[in-house]
A protein has these predicted regions:
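Residues forming the flavin
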Residues: 2-54, 58-148, 152-169, 173, ...
């Protein structure tokens, strides 16, 4: 069993694994050579004072390293299975698609904007010339609004659903493992486009579908239930519809 310890360090000390391992050994009264592994459980910054401090919560393992708990991501083929339409390819839409695949359903994602590579071109035009494509910009397109504007991970749902699995999924697709224990995890806009592409590829490899440049204009309602959506003159039907439209697509509800 590990021993748990919390250290208050300077930013430089918190970045030095050798230093905090040695300090943990002294605090626990054990020879440093008896420590098999020191694992960071949580790291947070206290900037209330003039000199910022880092609160480092550690698990200290003596004698032998623990076996890591296996994390399995089983995305079976859903080609030809019951289809569910997802409107929006931001975080909600992408994670909904992955969960549907786990449940044996085929997600079809409709995105009003363009894929993440094309979005880079459109955003460059905004910064260079002020030309804004209303459907492909900082707010719309593959990955959602945060892909090119920030990269911080924020949720109000830590008490609902498997928050850690969501982080593990991002690590599986290329995010750094530090997001698993940072108090304010941050992937970064330099890494997010590649991660979004990998998630899309996972969905496609499992038989899911993506349709870009497809703005939803209306809902198809039959018998009091939503049975699909209209993209202009094109009807896309499904057993259910997930509206994962984010905060900017207010027009779909008007």
């Amino acid at each position: 069993m590990p021993q748990n310890i919390t250290l208050v360090l300077t930013p430089r000390q918190a970045a030095d694994a050798k230093y905090y391992t040695s300090l943990a050994a002294r605090r626990l009264g054990m020879p440093e050579q008896d420590i098999a592994l020191v694992r960071v459980v949580k790291r947070s910054i206290d900037a209330r004072q003039r000199q910022p401090k880092v609160n480092l919560s550690l698990e200290v393992y003596a004698d032998r390293e623990p076996r890591p708990a296996p994390v399995h991501f089983d995305y079976p083929s859903v080609a030809g299975r019951t289809e569910v339409v997802i409107v929006g390819s931001g975080p909600a839409g992408l994670f909904a698609a992955l969960r549907l695949i786990e449940l044996g359903l085929r997600p079809v994602i409709l995105e009003r904007g363009r894929d993440v590579s094309a979005r880079k071109v459109d955003i460059a035009q905004i910064n260079r010339n002020g030309d804004v494509d209303p459907d492909s910009n900082y707010a719309f397109g593959e990955g959602g609004a945060g892909t090119f504007s920030d990269g911080k991970l924020f949720t109000r749902s830590k008490k609902r659903g498997d928050y850690n699995k969501a982080l593990q999924t991002l690590v599986f697709h290329g995010a750094t493992p530090e997001i698993l224990y940072e108090a304010h995890p941050h992937i970064g806009t330099d890494k997010l486009p590649r991660i979004m592409q990998r998630i899309r590829q996972t969905i496609l490899d499992a038989g899911g579908g993506f349709v870009f440049n497809s703005r939803v204009t209306d809902l198809e309602i039959k018998g009091g239930r939503v049975r699909g959506v209209w993209c202009g003159a094109t009807l896309v039907e499904g057993a259910a519809v997930v509206l994962a439209t984010g905060h900017s697509a207010r027009d779909i509800y008007e």
